[in-house]
């Protein structure tokens, strides 16, 4: 015969004080106050991140919401300016080796990689950042702009540049693999994507959005080949995004004007996740290695001139521990 515990589940823990690091949704009885409590939930929300030192669109960036680098972009003209962000304010750092726009970046603030872009022509330039200065790497095997770059924390030694556009064709389905010393041709993506975003690692990656042919699609990488991924809920052309293949975020872009929609990916499907504080497109000036948290600075907000110095942070909003009542 089944026991009561087998039928009804485990007993609720009785604790004299609330746990300091409870699991989301955890329930316990506080014996001191005589109350039943449930642990807080962390809900990612967007908030203002302050004013970026310069206005631009098609900038690039990498890092986290509390330790980021935002650099370059079309101001116009194209610029080489770079700034660090500490979660509160910006400070200048060493300029990027060449003015450009349309590149993408990935990695932590002290070990980031920026690749590609456009400056009077499509670029094979790619550079490492060590937290203080830039170093130029061997050129990419293919010039591209409007690409997505993935690699996460290992970007300087294991990265993939995804799709974009280049000099040989308006758009490309090619990718480029980087091992820390050289770039080689990688597995082609099923559909070309200009202005795409990417996240994850070279063994488990994701690309999302882009200008065409379908701005709602995503692509999944398994370490050797790309395949069609789940469809997003709204189009994200020239959007921002990144994270991991099991915890990604995509935000902003162009949909008959600048888009504020945000979506989270959990490894199986995309879910609508509220709106940005300010709608922006052309927003690769972002820091997303800890997706679904994110930081984005600059972009196009649809105003004239079509560029902005706004920055936005998407972090965890802590819902306080709640007392369970009958009301």
Regions found by a protein language model. Give the residues of each.
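Polar, enzyme-active/binding microenvironments
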Residues: 1-327
